[in-house]
């Protein structure tokens, strides 16, 4: 345990505090999502904005971009859910064939875009100059390959959540589970623990939403 917290040696205190706050609001957001409660979005926005800053500081661009996307999609989802909510609780449905085509397009876009960002990473870090650098996939770190994959998973999951589709939980479960060791490897212990909790809550959320669909067409109860 001491070795785990040793990852924070030399890290500025305010960064650790911001990570803890971001984790707390992220936990609240996922819990509200499980309950089908519209408060998933305001709490999520606080968390994602904090993580955009933190991930920019740690030069984890793929993660930073997906959190920026989360922020924008949370605003979109907030508006969308507000139009279809009763007492802050929304109705849910299953993903249609058309939805799956959109998911495939979003996933492909994400894979292409984030791969391009990491491919150009040496160029970007060199103040957008090609002098003395070379581009290539051989420069990719193992965590960056995983980051490309999880970013696509989360992007699709976030869109499905905004559309109130039960299948969003499947993407969250897979992405959250992969992120546990990923963030531990990146030296962000609290964030790794957050994703462990997210995995558990996502499983609970899927079970609860599935039970709702099976038993009644009425909105989820708080």
Feature annotation, model-predicted:
Residues 27-55:
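Long, highly hydrophobic alpha-helical transmembrane signal-anchor segments
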Residues 44-95:
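Hydrophobic/aromatic-rich structural module bridging two neighboring secondary-structure elements via a short loop
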């Amino acid at each position: 345990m001491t070795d785990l917290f040793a990852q924070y040696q030399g890290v500025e205190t305010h960064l650790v505090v911001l990570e803890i706050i971001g984790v707390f609001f992220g936990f609240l957001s996922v819990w509200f999502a499980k309950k089908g409660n519209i408060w998933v979005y305001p709490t999520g926005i606080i968390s994602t904005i904090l993580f955009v800053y933190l991930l920019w500081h740690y030069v984890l661009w793929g993660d930073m971009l997906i959190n920026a996307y989360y922020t924008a999609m949370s605003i979109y989802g907030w508006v969308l859910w507000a139009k279809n909510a009763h007492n802050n609780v929304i109705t849910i449905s299953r993903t249609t064939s058309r939805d799956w085509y959109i998911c495939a397009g979003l996933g492909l876009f994400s894979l292409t875009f984030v791969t391009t960002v990491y491919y150009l990473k040496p160029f970007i870090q060199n103040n957008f100059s090609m002098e003395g650098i070379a581009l290539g996939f051989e420069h990719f770190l193992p965590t960056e390959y995983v980051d490309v994959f999880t970013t696509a998973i989360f992007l699709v999951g976030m869109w499905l959540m905004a559309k109130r589709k039960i299948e969003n939980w499947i993407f969250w479960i897979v992405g959250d589970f992969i992120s546990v060791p990923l963030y531990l490897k990146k030296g962000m212990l609290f964030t790794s623990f957050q994703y462990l909790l997210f995995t558990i809550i996502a499983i609970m959320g899927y079970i609860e939403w599935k039970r709702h669909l099976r038993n009644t067409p009425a909105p989820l109860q708080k």
